[in-house]
């Protein structure tokens, strides 16, 4: 249904004013940001297409979208693209700010959300490391390796060198499972143990290894696997 055909109280802006933003769907919130559609494509349809980007479905996928992804959507001109990219970047910065201002372990949920934002929608496996200071606040997130996780695909020396470069006091390991399943495999456990041993030599603690997928995450520390 086109936006103009909805009853006034059901239109996104009026609904938000009356009931608050949490009462709106993702599509409705996006429609407010976009404001208008185009001839033959209403703003609600445009918002729906943004949540169905090829290989980047849902909000987590949209948060990883770049300029080229948005340009491919018919009806998104330069102005709307710039507006959306600015909103998405602000969302990413807000999540990173939470981890920089307080210890990561004080909010494991924030860590999981942050990692899902960066990794969950990837179609290939990515291994990343959160480098933390002595108070366990975020210094940086770096993607280290791509491909199926095995002992031979993750080089402990490279992780140690990057940790020393950042003067990290601790790290959180992370990778995604494109399959959508977040169970830790034998390879995941072996890689974690190898990195723990290597980082222990330079007095850097591995606080956790988080596995993420769209809508799901697993903390190996939380499961008693570290």
UniProtKB/Swiss-Prot annotation:
Molecular function via GO: metal ion binding; metallopeptidase activity
Keywords: Hydrolase, Metal-binding, Metalloprotease, Protease, Zinc
Family statement drawn from the similarity comment of this UniProt entry: Belongs to the UPF0758 family.
Domain MPN: 104-226
Superkingdom of source: Bacteria
Annotated positions binding Zn(2+): 175, 177, 188
Short sequence motif named JAMM motif, residue ranges: 175-188
Hydrolase among keywords: yes
GO biological process: proteolysis
Name of the protein described by the UniProt record: UPF0758 protein Daci_1904
Record-linked InterPro entries: MPN (IPR037518), RadC_JAB (IPR025657), RuvA_2-like (IPR010994), UPF0758 (IPR001405), UPF0758_CS (IPR020891), UPF0758_N (IPR046778)
């Amino acid at each position: 249904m086109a936006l103009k055909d909805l009853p006034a109280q059901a239109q996104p802006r009026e609904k938000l004013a009356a009931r608050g933003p949490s009462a709106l769907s993702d599509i409705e919130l996006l429609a407010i940001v976009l404001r208008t559609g185009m001839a033959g494509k209403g703003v609600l349809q445009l918002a729906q297409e943004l949540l169905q980007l090829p290989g980047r479905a849902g909000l987590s996928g949209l948060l990883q979208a770049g300029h080229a992804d948005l340009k491919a959507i018919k009806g998104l001109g330069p102005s709307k693209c710039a507006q959306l990219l600015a909103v998405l970047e602000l969302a990413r910065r807000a999540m990173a700010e939470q981890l920089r201002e307080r210890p990561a372990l004080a909010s494991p949920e924030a860590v999981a959300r942050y990692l899902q934002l960066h990794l969950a929608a990837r179609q290939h496996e990515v291994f990343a490391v959160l480098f933390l200071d002595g108070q366990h606040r975020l210094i940086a997130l770096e993607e280290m390796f791509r491909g199926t996780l095995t002992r031979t695909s993750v080089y402990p020396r490279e992780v140690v060198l990057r940790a020393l470069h950042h003067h990290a006091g601790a790290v959180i390991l992370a990778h995604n499972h494109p399959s959508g399943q977040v169970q830790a495999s034998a390879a995941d456990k072996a890689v974690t143990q190898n990195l723990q041993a290597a980082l222990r030599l330079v007095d850097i603690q591995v606080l956790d290894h988080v596995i993420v997928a769209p809508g799901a995450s697993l903390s190996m520390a939380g499961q008693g696997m570290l």
